[in-house]
């Protein structure tokens, strides 16, 4: 099923989010396409270490505007709780035919090797659980690791991923809060692109907070979209009634 592009007047109206002193703007331009994307949700990634929750990164997930009508077909009217607990809902976000963008901002310093090895480990686990790990994915993992090998990420720097509907994964880096106009590398592997996002917001994703934030914001946006659809259909029905 395809959806026509959303006009600027239909671009989702959302607020910025501040998560652990990191601010995510309500919209950004993708370094892969220059398309405007809206903030779907944001949260932290951390671990309990000796009884203390330590935050490593703060993550924001942006979506193309046609994600709202696309997801509304099946999910409008669902509550935040229903969406947050739904594996199929987040699979549909991961695999949907709309652009996604992920901004991962460091709270603690990480080397590129540390970050990329953990991400690819999670991706491989997802593929093996789905029975879809092939030589193509193994080569994509090698390229991913190579991109990050010499990098270091101090606090405040960001790793950026743009996922195109056709399946390419554009990688970019930022040393501050800015988003570069272009990426530094592109990996043409749809399963890797999807797995990077799924490793964050999927069933066993590393950021339950981001998952909940997306569920909450999309539940509201889909309800708003439904109200606008109903109003539009009502006005069409009225017009047809007058003509008849």
UniProtKB/Swiss-Prot annotation:
<feature type="binding site">
    <location>
        <position position="199"/>
    </location>
    <ligand>
        <name>substrate</name>
    </ligand>
</feature>
<dbReference type="InterPro" id="IPR016089">
    <property type="entry name" value="Chalcone_isomerase_bundle_sf"/>
</dbReference>
<dbReference type="GO" id="GO:0009813">
    <property type="term" value="P:flavonoid biosynthetic process"/>
</dbReference>
<dbReference type="InterPro" id="IPR044164">
    <property type="entry name" value="CFI"/>
</dbReference>
<comment type="function">
    <text>Catalyzes the intramolecular cyclization of bicyclic chalcones into tricyclic (S)-flavanones. Responsible for the isomerization of 4,2',4',6'-tetrahydroxychalcone (also termed chalcone) into naringenin.</text>
</comment>
<comment type="similarity">
    <text>Belongs to the chalcone isomerase family.</text>
</comment>
<dbReference type="InterPro" id="IPR036298">
    <property type="entry name" value="Chalcone_isomerase_sf"/>
</dbReference>
<feature type="binding site">
    <location>
        <position position="57"/>
    </location>
    <ligand>
        <name>substrate</name>
    </ligand>
</feature>
<dbReference type="Pfam" id="PF02431">
    <property type="entry name" value="Chalcone"/>
</dbReference>
<feature type="binding site">
    <location>
        <position position="122"/>
    </location>
    <ligand>
        <name>substrate</name>
    </ligand>
</feature>
<comment type="pathway">
    <text>Secondary metabolite biosynthesis; flavonoid biosynthesis.</text>
</comment>
<dbReference type="GO" id="GO:0045430">
    <property type="term" value="F:chalcone isomerase activity"/>
</dbReference>
<dbReference type="InterPro" id="IPR016088">
    <property type="entry name" value="Chalcone_isomerase_3-sand"/>
</dbReference>
<keyword id="KW-0284">Flavonoid biosynthesis</keyword>
<protein>
    <recommendedName>
        <fullName>Chalcone--flavanone isomerase</fullName>
        <ecNumber>5.5.1.6</ecNumber>
    </recommendedName>
</protein>
<dbReference type="InterPro" id="IPR016087">
    <property type="entry name" value="Chalcone_isomerase"/>
</dbReference>
<feature type="site" description="Important for catalytic activity">
    <location>
        <position position="115"/>
    </location>
</feature>
<keyword id="KW-0413">Isomerase</keyword>
């Amino acid at each position: 099923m395809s959806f026509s592009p959303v006009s600027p007047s239909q671009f989702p109206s959302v607020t910025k989010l501040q998560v652990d002193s990191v601010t995510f703007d309500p919209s950004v331009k993708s370094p892969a396409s220059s398309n405007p994307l809206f903030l779907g949700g944001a949260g932290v990634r951390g671990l309990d270490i000796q009884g203390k929750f330590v935050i490593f990164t703060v993550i924001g997930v942006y979506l193309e505007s046609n994600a709202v009508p696309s997801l509304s077909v099946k999910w409008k009217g669902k509550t935040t709780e229903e969406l947050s607990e739904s594996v199929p809902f987040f699979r549909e976000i991961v695999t949907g035919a709309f652009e996604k963008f992920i901004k991962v901002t460091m709270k603690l310093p990480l080397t590129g090797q540390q970050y990329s090895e953990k991400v690819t480990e999670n991706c491989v686990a997802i593929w093996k659980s789905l029975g879809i790990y092939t030589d193509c994915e193994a080569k994509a993992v090698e390229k991913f690791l190579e991109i990050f090998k010499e990098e270091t990420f101090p606090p405040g720097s960001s790793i950026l991923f743009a996922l195109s509907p056709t399946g390419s994964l554009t990688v970019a880096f930022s040393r501050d809060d800015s988003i570069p106009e272009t990426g530094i590398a592109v990996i043409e592997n749809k399963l890797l692109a999807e797995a990077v996002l799924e490793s964050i917001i999927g069933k066993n994703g590393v950021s339950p907070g981001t998952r909940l934030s997306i569920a909450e914001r999309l539940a509201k946006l889909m309800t708003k979209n439904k109200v606008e659809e109903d109003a539009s259909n009502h006005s069409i029905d009225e017009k047809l009634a007058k003509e008849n």
